[in-house]
Design a protein with these regions (language model features):
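Rhodanese-like catalytic fold shared by cysteine-dependent sulfurtransferases
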Residues: 1-19, 26-60, 66-101
């Protein structure tokens, strides 16, 4: 599900079953990330798919990338893999004005 920043962040902060998932490259992550995010690089092909398959399907995933494109694709892929609750950050880090590390 695509969510705008305010709704995405509010939902995440109030979700006790939430996991932040950053699907950007290492170079992008080095420029700043949302605190406590789990990182799996979208461009790692089979390794990325394997990493997704090994995630806990009972969790709620708040997924982001640089622009919202890769994270949107990741949410669709996760849904196909049996994840029920995935939330894409529309605009990604390009439009993020929340906390970073």
């Amino acid at each position: 599900m695509d969510l705008q920043q305010d709704q995405w962040w509010s939902n995440f902060k109030n979700d006790e079953n939430a996991v932040l998932l950053d699907v950007r490259t290492e170079d992008e992550v080095s420029e700043g990330a949302i605190p406590n995010a789990v990182h799996h690089d979208f461009y790692q092909g089979q390794d990325f798919l394997t990493a997704l398959e090994n995630l806990d399907k009972s969790k709620n995933y708040y997924v982001y990338c640089r622009s919202g494109n890769r994270s949107g694709q990741t949410c669709l892929l996760m849904n196909q893999l049996g994840f029920e609750n995935t939330y894409n950050l529309v605009g990604g880090m390009n439009e993020w004005n929340g906390p970073t590390v």
